[in-house]
């Protein structure tokens, strides 16, 4: 999930303090505050082009909007036990929201339309974040002392495969032309075209990955004071900020 998405005819952006803004162009002075709830914590956004879904750290855990202006809370089923819906992605069966499963919570949330949500048992405990979809499979990262990369064609319980484990933490990730690209805290990257077979590229980045996204035909990775650009997730070119 992102903190800024292009939805229909406008940008929608979220903040750590529970605010949601929209803008037709993204330029300074064009942003309008649409929602403000400081108690909700961090927001993450995903859109399928029809409806925008927002997940958050407090109840109600899911909000939806067709236009970015009016936001409607959606019910997470009783017994879900969700303490935090950490992130969300739009993909094959609809929307997949990952959760903080470090304690009693042992569910993902899956929805075909963003409105009705169904619990799906996770394959392991842990902090599940950065769900991704490449057009064929979901990939979700399980963080902690090590990174576990789990893959599923549907997001349904019982369909997840542990595809890769590493002592390196891979918190930043994106999808570029169907390829999964993960950035590590040690300047390495991981790439995969199918979500199951992963290739390690040691020292591919000029520093640790602080943020990563895809824009057009390139992936962009932010570092402290610089950023780097790649067309394949393997070879990166560093540039100064500003």
What are these regions (language model features)?
Residues 33-39, 74-79, 120-124, 162-167, ...:
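Short loop/turn motifs that cap or connect beta-strands within the blades
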